[in-house]
Each structure stands twice: as C-alpha cells, then as structure tokens.
Amino acid sequence: MKNELYADEIAARRTFAIISHPDAGKTTITEKVLLFGQAIQTAGTVKGRGSNQHAKSDWMEMEKQRGISITTSVMQFPYRQALVNLLDTPGHEDFSEDTYRTLTAVDCCLMVIDAAKGVEDRTRKLMEVTRLRDTPILTFMNKVDRDIRDPMELLDEVESELRIACAPITWPIGCGKLFKGIYHLAKDETYLYQSGQGHTIQAVRVVKGLDNPELDQAVGEDLAAQLREELELVQGASHPFDEQAFLAGELTPIFFGTALGNFGIDHMLDGLVAWAPPPMPRQTDVRVVSAREEKFTGFVFKIQANMDPRHRDRVAFLRVVSGRYEKSMKLRQVRTGKDVVIADALTFMAGDRSHIEEAYAGDIIGLHNHGTIQIGDTFTQGEELKFTGIPNFAPELFRRIRLRDPLKQKQLLKGLVQLSEEGAVQVFRPLANNDLIVGAVGVLQFDVVVARLKSEYNVEALYEPVNVSTARWVECGDAKKLEEFKRKNELNLVLDGGDNLSYIAPSMVNLNLTRERYPDIQFHKTREH
C-alpha cells in the first residue's frame, strides 16, 4: 500500500451526521448540501404534498407519504478538496435508537436549528448523545428568510441550554421579508440574498468590507447601521472561533442561512471541510484502533432491509475505521469467527447503489446480508477485537402482533426477525406461549412494522395492547439460580430476536419487587450489540 496516497485519502475524508428537531429543515439542508457537492443537479424540494419530486434522501414508501426521514441514509460526495460522507438521521422522535447508533459512526455533527423557534426538545436529547463522545458540532441557524427570534437571544439559548460556547462565523442582515443577506465575520464580506433561487446554485453578489458605502446602498442605511451595531455587540459578547475547543466538543461555530433559499449552506460546508476532523481513532475491547493503520477494521451500526424492492435484500452499513477495503477481500466476522469474501460492497447515494472497488477509513460501505450480520458486528483482517459503544436499548412501548391470516405465522416470524435485526423494533417470544410481542422506543414504529410487513412480506397483521410496561435483559453468573428463576417466572420471560433471555414486567412495581426477590439476577436496561 502506498502510504502517502493512503494518508492523503484519509486526510480528505469528513464523516458527519445532521441532527435536528423534526421540521427544522434537515432534509432540505441534506438536499442543498448534495447540490453543492454536485451530487444532484436540481434539488427535489421536499414534501411538496402531491408533487412527484420527493427529496433524494427520503426514499422508503412510508417516508414519501409522511414527509419525514425514518431511516438513516448515507450519501457520499466531493466538496472542495474533501470527500464528504453525510449520514442523514431520522428527524422523527420515535426513531431515537437508530439515530443514536448512527451518531456512533460519525466524527462530527451539524446541528440544524429553526431560527424562529430556537432550541427544541429533540435537539437537547441528541446533544446529550453527542456529549458522550465529545463529538465536534457545527450549528446552522435555518429559515432566516422567515421572521426569526433575535440572533443574540438564539446564541444565549444555545449556550445556556446546550452547555456549549458559540462562535458566530456569519451574521444575518434583517430577516423575513426584509432578509438582505449574510455578513461573514472572518472574511469581512457581505453576501447579498436573492429570493426564489433555491433550486440551483446562483452567483452571489459580494460586498467587501463592513464600512463600504456600497453596503448601505445594497441593504439600505437602516439595516447597514443595525448590522454594524449588532456586530459590535457580538464581537464583545461572544467567543472567537477556537479550533481546539471545537474539536473537543466545547464550542460550536454558528452559521446563519436559509436551506430552502439555498443561501449560507456553502459557508457552513466550507467550515466543515476546514475544521471537522478527519477519521478518528476508535476504542475496542482490547486496544484503540487508529484510522491510519494499514489493516482493515470496521463495525456495523445499522441494518436496512429491502433497500431494493426488486430484490429481497438486506444491507448492513459498515463504518470503515482503519485500512482500506478492496474488492473481493477476505474479512473476518469476529463474532462468528468466520472468514468471508466481500466481493460486492456498495456505496450509496440515498437509495441509488453502486458497487465500489475501494473504500478508506471514514467511509460507509454496504455489505449484502442474508441474515448472518448483526448490528455491532466487527470485521477485521483476522485480528480478534470488537468495537465498543454501540448500544441496544430496552424498549418502552409494547404491542402484541396478531395475524389476519393465521396460516402466515412463518412469514410473520421471518419478517419480524428481519425487522428486529435492523434495530427498528425488538421482537420478544414468550417462553410460555406462541404470542409475538413487539417492543419499540416510539409509537410510530408499530405503524412502520405493520406497513412494512404488508409491503415487503405480504403479511397482513395488526397490533393490540399487551400488559407489558417495561423489559430488561436478564443475566446471572450462577446457572442453578438462573434455572430456578426461569422456573418460577416463566410467564414473564421472553427471548429477544438474538435469543437473549429477557424479563417483561406489567409494571415498574413488579420489576422492583422481582429485583428484590432475586438479588443474584442482573436486570439490564441496555445491552452492547
């Protein structure tokens, strides 16, 4: 392997995810980012109800109907001298587990905030997740072409609620109907806005210098005076950009713009490419793996069924941590101990797939999966190690799945097991009867399961309430005590999709009593994959 070439390839990679509250404009930003990366020529503006141009990243049937991104898609595109891997995460709050796992596969996040609303609930939760790994965050204040809150107030709110320092890089001139453009603090340049140009990349008029009389002519004397006043305040009250603090996850650069108007996105992308880290080292159960190591390693963070309705396939998304993937290379699946030849890994452009010849640390590749790969699986060139920190959560909501046609039990079980391997829901099979119980983190997931059982497995099913309020994975070092526990609690015991023993409790009171009664049994709320 040519080391210099390899080092250059890694240095060029930027792998990031977009996090936001639903409706903050994340899917539109994804579209416009791809437009700037020349990955698509005109952006399919999102969710024009009744229009045929659905956004490139919302590609599953149910997403198209609802206009929300339910599953994570992966898109790769070149920008300036970098090669950017963008992971689009579900914006809907029901899909937190999938999003959580996606955030373990990136080196940086872009936080999108609706500037009319400020910090919202979902943004807080996602920020907590990025904190666990001190992920660097860039912030895009979206929708400045609408009436927004005072920009200084927005910065204060981000600092106090999300506990991260703000360094404004760009600043809006006016907002709503009076929105005139953006001033770039580092470059001392003003970019003037033209509305109605959101579908393509337009040439933007630039005014150099804050004291340039041309600025007063372009935006009007009042707004120019207001801008100069605000900037004095901003420079006095906010933090200058500090790259080390950014990389430590302590400071976020702030960009203003409008995704729908396609304005300000390029400034944010320039910042991402300049400051976001190249592929970072990762922790395993035995050592830390550096991206610059020559031997290939990677982990699976997501499984997606039926990305191609014409083929009954499943694809495992794998983050390359080190080394280089080459076509037809032999890799060890550490969990099973088997060596497999990966002849046809995929790269993605949200739903469009193409086979790749090579991939480097930081890239996301797709492996065809016929039921043998699980979330959390590590692949290496023979070394026995396992990447850590890819969680599985105990579900909070439960339903019993019933068949309309009882003869389709076999297809139902197959469909549910495949969906559970994706990590969208968890399936539990009681030891005492033939029921099938599905557990999820959010209500919408049950609708997704029923819709996908019908469209992908031709199984008509419905769900009904079940007397379960919580579940815990069960472990015990003493086989004899575990057997006794199983004998006395059979009615509350189930096996999950991976045949792990779990306890389902009708109430928290029941769970706490059972815990007290069996001090030797461990009840776990999360499991490492």
UniProtKB/Swiss-Prot annotation:
Localization (cell): Cytoplasm
Keywords: Cytoplasm, GTP-binding, Nucleotide-binding, Protein biosynthesis
Annotated GO MF terms: GTP binding; GTPase activity; guanosine tetraphosphate binding; translation release factor activity, codon nonspecific; translation release factor activity, codon specific
Residues reported to bind GTP: 20-27, 88-92, 142-145
PROSITE patterns: G_TR_1, G_TR_2
Pfam annotation, one family: GTP_EFTU
Domain tr-type G: 11-280
Keyword flag DNA damage: no
GO cellular component terms attached to this protein's record: cytosol
GO biological-process terms attached to the record: regulation of translational termination
Highest taxon of source: Bacteria
Function: Increases the formation of ribosomal termination complexes and stimulates activities of RF-1 and RF-2. It binds guanine nucleotides and has strong preference for UGA stop codons. It may interact directly with the ribosome. The stimulation of RF-1 and RF-2 is significantly reduced by GTP and GDP, but not by GMP.
NCBIfam families: prfC, PRK00741.1, small_GTP
Family: Belongs to the TRAFAC class translation factor GTPase superfamily. Classic translation factor GTPase family. PrfC subfamily.
Name of the protein this chain belongs to: Peptide chain release factor 3
